[in-house]
């Protein structure tokens, strides 16, 4: 029908929905504020976060999400200030963390109580400060007189007399619920506080999410199938990109072997052994052996020398009396010898 506004049902207060709202708030705070155009969005987002936390808190403590009547009468008379102290039973339960239970993660539980009751809730007395050294330093100073008292919760409210009494009564009832320790594993408020802390830290995971049916079917099949026990697989060392030394024979011994088998004039040495055929007979080239090719020239001492030459170099040179035959020597006949030609 034209003119009627469509009303949508509000989402249920679940941890996942609260986590989505917190993520939206972080994203909203990271964006620049363009002339205040996001003011209403931030206000609506804060109101929704407060509503979800309030419903979750009521569900945790009261066991239902039914909202208590928050209607207050009209103010009558001047504004007054009322306060009341509720002492924490630390002597009866010395190991219970009442301060963390009342304040909650980053003070969210106390802030939620203040928003719901309209009162200011503060933890005072011995052990109310996290830093014990600072607490001892401030003890006895002005405005720190409460450190000489026992641990207690101070509830204050400012309003008209008739309204302040109602607010204070509601706040006292809610705080008294927090001063009753629950058994380990049955503290629903502690579970909620841990969940809120995980949401704030970004580490929350919903434990109610079930695995797909396919995963269960595969797991059942794997359990029904026979199992074969095998030894652990050997761990191989990582392969190097470039070997430091060549795996095969280097190229220089083969070059020296060929140089030894050849005389300086190019003729094969008579005493040189022929390189046997095989994989080591040819020149082996690998792409990473080029540093070995830059070797100095082979010394002349590596070539074989005749034993007679070595002896002749040491002993005195022997004069030869026979005439060496010259290849171009002319033949002198008797007629030419007589004429002198």
UniProtKB/Swiss-Prot annotation:
A motif (SH3-binding) lies at residues 276-279. Disruption phenotype: Embryonic lethality between 9.5 and 10.5 days post coitum (dpc). Embryos show a lack of large vitelline vessels in the yolk sacs, kinky neural tubes, pericardial effusion, open neural tubes and incomplete embryonic turning. Conditional deletion in cardiomyocytes in the adult heart induces dilation of the ventricles and a rapid decline in cardiac function, associated with severe disruption of sarcomere organization. Conditional deletion in neural stem cells leads to hypomyelination in the central nervous system due to impaired cholesterol biosynthesis. Residues 11-82 are annotated as: Qua1 domain. Changing residue 21 to A: Impaired homodimerization. One of its GO terms (cellular component) is synapse. Methylated by PRMT1. Its main location: cytoplasm. It holds the Pfam family STAR_dimer. The record marks 97, 120, 124, 130, 190, 193 as: Involved in RNA binding. GO terms for biological process: 3'-UTR-mediated mRNA destabilization; axon ensheathment; intracellular mRNA localization; long-chain fatty acid biosynthetic process; microglia differentiation; mRNA stabilization; mRNA transport; myelination. The keyword Glycoprotein does not apply. The modification Asymmetric dimethylarginine is found at residue 242. Changing residue 17 to F: Impaired homodimerization. The modification Phosphoserine is found at residue 188. The modification Omega-N-methylarginine is found at residues 227, 242, 256. Changing residue 292 to F: Abolishes phosphorylation and RNA-binding. A motif (Nuclear localization signal) lies at residues 324-330. Residues 87-153 form the KH domain. Disulfide bonds: none annotated. The KH domain and the Qua2 region are involved in RNA binding. Homodimer; does not require RNA to homodimerize. Able to heterodimerize with BICC1. Belongs to the quaking family. This is KH domain-containing RNA-binding protein QKI. It comes from Mus musculus (Mouse). The lineage of its organism: Eukaryota, Metazoa, Chordata, Craniata, Vertebrata. The gene is Qki.
């Amino acid at each position: 029908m034209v003119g009627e506004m469509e009303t949508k049902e509000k989402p249920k207060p679940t941890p996942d929905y609260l986590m989505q709202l917190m993520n939206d708030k972080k994203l909203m705070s990271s964006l620049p504020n363009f002339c205040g155009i996001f003011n209403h969005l931030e206000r609506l987002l804060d109101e929704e976060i407060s509503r979800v936390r309030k419903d979750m808190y009521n569900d945790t403590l009261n066991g239902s999400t039914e909202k208590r009547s928050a209607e207050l009468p009209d103010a009558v008379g001047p504004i007054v200030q009322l306060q009341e102290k509720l002492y924490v039973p630390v002597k009866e339960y010395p190991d219970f963390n009442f301060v963390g239970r009342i304040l909650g993660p980053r003070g969210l539980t106390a802030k939620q109580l203040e928003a719901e009751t309209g009162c200011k809730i503060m933890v005072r007395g011995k052990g109310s400060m996290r830093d014990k050294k600072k607490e001892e330093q401030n003890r006895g100073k002005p405005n720190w007189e409460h450190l000489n008292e026992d641990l207690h919760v101070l509830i204050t409210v400012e309003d008209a007399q008739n309204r302040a009494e109602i607010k204070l009564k509601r706040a006292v009832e809610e705080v008294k619920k927090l001063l009753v320790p629950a058994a380990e594993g049955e503290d629903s408020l502690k579970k909620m506080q841990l969940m809120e802390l995980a949401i704030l830290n970004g580490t929350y995971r919903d434990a109610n999410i079930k695995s797909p049916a396919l995963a269960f079917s595969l797991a059942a099949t794997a359990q029904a199938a026979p199992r074969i026990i095998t030894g652990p697989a050997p761990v191989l060392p990582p392969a190097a990109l470039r070997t430091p030394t060549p795996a095969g024979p280097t190229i220089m011994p083969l070059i020296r072997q060929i140089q030894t088998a050849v005389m300086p004039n190019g003729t094969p040495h008579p005493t040189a052994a022929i390189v046997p055929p095989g994989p080591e007979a040819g020149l082996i080239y690998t792409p990473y052996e080029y540093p070995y090719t830059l070797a100095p020239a082979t010394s002349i001492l590596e070539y074989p020398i005749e034993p007679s030459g070595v002896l002749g170099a040491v002993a005195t040179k022997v004069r030869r009396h026979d005439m060496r035959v010259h290849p171009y020597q002319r033949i002198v006949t008797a007629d030419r010898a007589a004429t002198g030609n």
